[in-house]
A protein has these predicted regions:
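Acidic, polar-rich low-complexity tracts and alpha-helical solenoid repeat scaffolds
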Residues: 2-7, 20-274
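Bacterial N-terminal signal peptides
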Residues: 10-19
């Protein structure tokens, strides 16, 4: 039922976009009669309008090429161009339409030399719709999935560095959501809840940029539930992995205090992440 509702919504958006696009641009763009290479004419005009951020006009040229010249060598790039025009509009509706275009490209042209670009733009469309850490993270999860697909399949492509950066940002956003929930549990003194949220998060993503706070909160939570031997490794990981952190000095003090009170600091528990 949800899938059908989503499909109906997408169909309605596509139909509305076609109507509005046609009205705004004066109708379909066609090459002048007698043009030697009409498909190239449409492609060049689409590129010119795309460069000038004339999204609707560019889309009409690309669309005419895609629909009228199925054997054109420019057809695949024009299909990408349609997606890029929707990306340029930067609205919730246009991102949905862009995602549809890039998914179709990957289905129609899975071995095309620009398939990597379609995958990158697909991931970016989700990335551009990510919400703040304590709001719905559906788009964040989709961005992670699609950027991970890019990193897995296209590690030798020039956009790999940017893809990895965006993947890291998306993972951090999702981790910040878990961290926020854990912080709430810590604040209301439900320390098992904080531990139960943070440990799986760090196991799943040990490279979380904000893990210094997670380490400190875990150490403090284990101390609160009278498990100092479990707390110590998290304070030590914080000190070892971060030269700068607002929790660094506090962690060092907790390490000194725990080592002074534990029967033997040597061989103390390795921590719940092991």
């Amino acid at each position: 039922m949800i899938r059908m509702k989503t499909l109906c919504t997408l169909t309605a958006i596509v139909a509305l976009a076609a109507v509005l696009g046609g009205c705004a641009s004066g109708g379909p763009k066609r090459p002048p009669a007698g043009t030697a290479e009409p498909d190239k004419f449409l492609f060049d005009r689409g590129n010119e309008n795309l460069a000038r951020k004339r999204w609707i006009a560019a889309r009409e040229y690309y669309r005419q090429l895609v629909d009228s010249y199925p054997q054109s060598p420019y057809r695949a790039d024009a299909k990408l161009g349609v997606g890029d025009t929707y990306m340029g509009e930067k609205t919730a509706e246009s991102y949905v339409l862009a995602i549809n275009e890039f998914r179709e490209f990957l289905n129609f042209y899975p071995t095309n030399k620009r398939a990597h670009y379609a995958q990158f733009r697909l991931a970016t469309a989700h990335f551009s719709q990510m919400k703040s850490a304590m709001r719905d993270q559906t788009e964040t999860r989709e961005a992670i999935k699609e950027f991970q697909n890019y990193v897995t399949r296209y590690a030798d492509q020039p956009l790999i560095g940017e893809a990895r950066d965006h993947l890291r940002q998306a993972k951090d956003r999702l981790d910040e959501w878990d961290l926020g929930v854990a912080e709430h549990y810590f604040r209301i003194k439900w320390y098992p809840g904080a531990i139960g949220r943070l440990v799986p998060m760090l196991r799943t993503d040990p490279e979380f940029t904000g893990r210094d706070k997670a380490y400190y909160m875990l150490g403090a939570s284990y101390e609160k539930v009278n498990k100092p031997a479990e707390a110590l490794p998290f304070y030590e990981k914080l000190v070892k992995e971060f030269e700068q952190s607002e929790y660094l000095e506090q962690a060092k003090r907790r390490i000194d205090d725990l080592k002074a009170t534990l029967p033997s600091a040597q061989g103390v528990g390795k921590g719940a992440l092991q």
